[in-house]
Amino acid sequence: MGIFVCRNSLRMLNVRWLYHRCLSLYNSNHGFNEAKIKEKLAQFTGGSVDLSKMDNGIAEICINNPSRMNAFTGTMMIELEERISDLENWKNGKGLIVYGAENTFCSGSDLNAVKAISNPQEGMMMCMLMQNTLTRLQRLPLISVALIQGKALGGGAELCTACDFRLMTEGSEIRFVHKQMGLVPGWGGAARLIHLIGSRHALKLLSGALRVHPENALELGLADNILLGTEDGFLSEAENWIMPYIKGPSDVSRAVKKVIISGREQKLEDALRTEKEIFGTVWGGLANLQALAKGTKHK
């Protein structure tokens, strides 16, 4: 009985931690009015953000606006937030692949929406919405991969940094073009880029608006692999690539992602305590007991 109570207490601690991790960065205390900016963005229609969830625990998000190089319209920004909310509540999920329709990843914000949100106040509201959304994407208990075909420009480059891994195809490129627009990244891309490749390399990419091709991205640590297949087969290749990392029970895979999130975002002492709590949710669990019975540790 005592063990049961202890394990349930640990689970409750983990639930509270996960809830805290999924909280948005900004709320009304920061001057963020989500309803107001969504009402503004809803005026700029077109495209879609499509979500599919498969029985193998892999979800796919497709940025679907090919006539605009998969640029985010206002309604697409809203839809992305809704898709992330859906995935936060998907208890059996293990992996996520983010890709763009018709062999192009994403070219950032649609210029029609950008031109209409020209004052700093509304621009910062849009920035806060997208930072909230992409931070929640990064904190999902799913191992995520950005499949980059064609161009990942501006906000598209920022989007790919919110995923755990990046797979690039031959001829693709990542480019932070913000400086050419008289801007800096606003969706969290600069902060995430520094964590990925270091401040010195990040400064070069941002200040020079440099084109990062697959080989260079691999060398920098921005990309994790280069896919060499055909256009019709890249999504299947991405699924095959992620499969070894999500193999096994979903609760174990999700626990692995959670300890990585805590280690990345919390102070050492807090991360250690969180790791202990998450460890308690899988110790003595079904997967652990089955592995012990089979003696699979060194196999």
Curated annotation (Swiss-Prot):
GO cellular component entries: cytosol
GO MF, one annotated term: carboxy-lyase activity
Catalysed conversion reaction: (2S)-ethylmalonyl-CoA + H(+) = butanoyl-CoA + CO2; (S)-methylmalonyl-CoA + H(+) = propanoyl-CoA + CO2; (2R)-ethylmalonyl-CoA + H(+) = butanoyl-CoA + CO2
Family annotation (SUPFAM superfamilies): ClpP/crotonase (SSF52096)
EC number: 4.1.1.94
Domain of life: Eukaryota
Keywords, alphabetical: Cytoplasm, Lyase
Entry's localization field: Cytoplasm, Cytosol
Record Pfam families: ECH_1
Known role: Decarboxylates ethylmalonyl-CoA, a potentially toxic metabolite, to form butyryl-CoA, suggesting it might be involved in metabolite proofreading. Acts preferentially on (S)-ethylmalonyl-CoA but also has some activity on the (R)-isomer. Also has methylmalonyl-CoA decarboxylase activity at lower level.
Family designation: Belongs to the enoyl-CoA hydratase/isomerase family.
Protein name: Ethylmalonyl-CoA decarboxylase
Organism: Xenopus tropicalis
Gene: echdc1
